[in-house]
Amino acid sequence: MAPRRRKAKRRRHTLRSECKDKCKCHVQCYVSPRKRRRKLKPQGDDDINTTHQQQAALTEEQRREEVEEEGEERERRGEEEREGEGGEEGEGREEAEEEEAEEKEAEEEEAEEAEEEAEEEEAEEAEAEEEEAEEEEAEEEEAEEAEEEEAEEAEEEAEEEEAEEEAEEEAEEAEEAEEEAEEEAEEAEEAEEAEEAEEEAEEAEEEAEEAEEEAEEAEEAEEAEEAEEEAEEAEEEEEEAGPSTPRLPHYKVVGQKPSTQPGGVPKLCLKMQPQHRSRLPKGKQSHDKVPKKYQARNKFFSQAAPSVLDLSPKSWCWVVDFWGPTDALYRLSRSLSFPGAVSSGIQTFPKGPHATGPWVYFITVYCRTFQTAKEVIKAQKKYEKKYPRSAKLKASLGKFSKSLPIE
């Protein structure tokens, strides 16, 4: 363990003369140097003139005290000299003369100091007069500025009055325009009423036609019900007669549909028999044919993902998804059939066997290079800027397909 050096104990001064006002041993006698050199400063709202007067008054009091002390010392010395040296009167006279001369010199010095103080007071008065003159000039300038501001305010008021008059004129013009607009609106309402009357007449004609069609449908329905009742009666008669051959199934296989997963089992396409006992709701039925212009699109919706999924993911690692309505996605997929990019079939989100709607349709575009994917996205952005109303592929993407980098 390293030896520790003891601190030397501080010696406390016993006498005040040893401190010499430099330490705090005698606290009751200590005066800090900051207080010793602090000068008299104006306090509160006092100005510098009152401060000078206070300083001058203090110096005069000090002088009086000094003069009184000197007089007392002289008297004491005179008494001592008279007691000790009675025979030396000549010397006493000389000393008295010297003292008188010193007193005269002191009085002359006091007179000179009084003159200097008077000169200082005169200089201070002159400075005060100059300050008053400057204040008067400043007041005159302020008065001139106030007059200028009043003149400017008067001008602004005049401008405001003119603006109010203009606003009133504009309001009158606006009222006239409103009256004209009301007249035009009344004319337009009259024209609309005439159109509504025509539409009501047309609707009445359509209702009459619909009533006729409903009457015809009711007759057909009655005939169909009668036919069904006859068929049921015939079946009941057959059942009563005895066991018959097994019934044909209600559905028949008309083709195969590829699986949605690669390498999956193909699904069977079933078609409902035209004659069956189960009743379907009115409207489209399962055996209705798809119009020719939608056949290719219907095939596209049911097709599987492209064979690009079986390839290595490194060569087709750049993927771009496009969302939107089915018809727009169909046209986009047709336009992306070139070597640089391949699009998948229509897909739905959310996926899964137990997923519930609403369905969102999208296609995935697999690009071979990053540059191709970049060009596809760039073309999409260009299409959004050029056709802002169909920015989210709500309209047909034929214009968009023209801007793609098809080789």
Curated annotation (Swiss-Prot):
| InterPro entries, per database record | EBNA1_DNA-bd_sf, LANA1_DNA-bd
GO CC annotation, single: host cell nucleus
Which UniProt keywords are present, listed alphabetically?
Early protein
Q: Name one Pfam family in it.
A: LANA1_DNA-bd
Chain spans, region Disordered = 34-268
Q: Is Isomerase among the key words of this record?
A: no
An MF annotation (GO) of this entry: DNA binding
Q: Which residue ranges have biased composition labelled Acidic residues?
A: 81-241
> What highest taxon heads this organism's lineage?
Viruses
Please give the family membership noted in the entry.
Belongs to the herpesviridae ICP22 family.
What is the name of the protein in this document? Transcriptional regulator ICP22 homolog
Q: What is the lineage of its organism?
A: Viruses, Duplodnaviria, Heunggongvirae, Peploviricota, Herviviricetes
Gene name, Swiss-Prot/TrEMBL: 73
